Amino acid sequence: MPRFDPHPARRPAIIAGASSGIGAATATELARRGFPVALGARRTDKLAKLVDDIRADGGEAVAFALDVTDADSVKSFVARSIDALGDIEVLVSGAGDMYPGRIHETSTDVFADQLQVHLIGANRLATAVLPQMVASRRGDVIFVGSDVALRQRPHMGAYGAAKAGLVAMVANLRMELEGTGVRASIVHPGPTLTEMGWQLSAEQVGPMLADWATWGQARHNYFLRAGDLARAIAFVAETPRGSHVVTMEVQPEAPLTDAPADRQQLQLPDEGMPQ
């Protein structure tokens, strides 16, 4: 009997939070690499457009409504994905939003909402797909973490607490799934240009970036793009059996030191999005 069952030629993947940002980029990247993909999110109109784009490029894609704060929605999404694509080989758990704010100015309800989306929602997805993966003796469950789970930043306490809980959950999964053929991994993005959290005005974002700089957490003005994380997640999923990418952190590279001075510090345009 082989030590490891090899990856099959067909590896259906489900991507939670696929309507925009890292999730959408990951769906596109995995489909480009030959993974059949099932996309889940609340904004089904955006999912439909993404499915059309993937199919137009020769990929295989389906989409279903998904709200990770609703247990029945998660179960329905996973069941419909399996019906459409077959047994799931890869889960990418990336659904989420972010509400920046100082802890003492953040309501307990908002704090709890962040836990529901980023921690409880991820748990719902994992427990929905893992029985089938364990029975199949293979699979990858890949969670989108955050560098704020590793090094806290001001104004991101609720989000960071939820992601720190996710780190602990994934560590437990990795230990408890050892020997089953299922690999649990977490990919931590650094600052990334996506819709999440950046719909704020300059008046809202300004104090946050200023506090980041005070604590030495905004040394330069380059942000990752969603595609950078998509490639990292695809790398984890495609890692050959017999090895396991447990944790990956991706940070934006600093501009060259001889770049103009205005490219060395975070700049804040009127709409609030860092340049």
For the regions a language model picked out, list residue spans one by one.
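Active-site loop-to-helix junction immediately N-terminal to the catalytic Tyr of the SDR YXXXK motif
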Residues: 106, 152-160, 172
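Substrate-binding pocket helix/loop in short-chain dehydrogenase/reductase
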Residues: 102-103, 107-115
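Conserved glycine-rich Rossmann-like NAD(P)H-binding loop of the short-chain dehydrogenase/reductase
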Residues: 33-50
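Active-site helix of classical SDR
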Residues: 126, 162
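Residue(s) in the substrate-gating loop at a strand-loop-helix junction
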Residues: 146
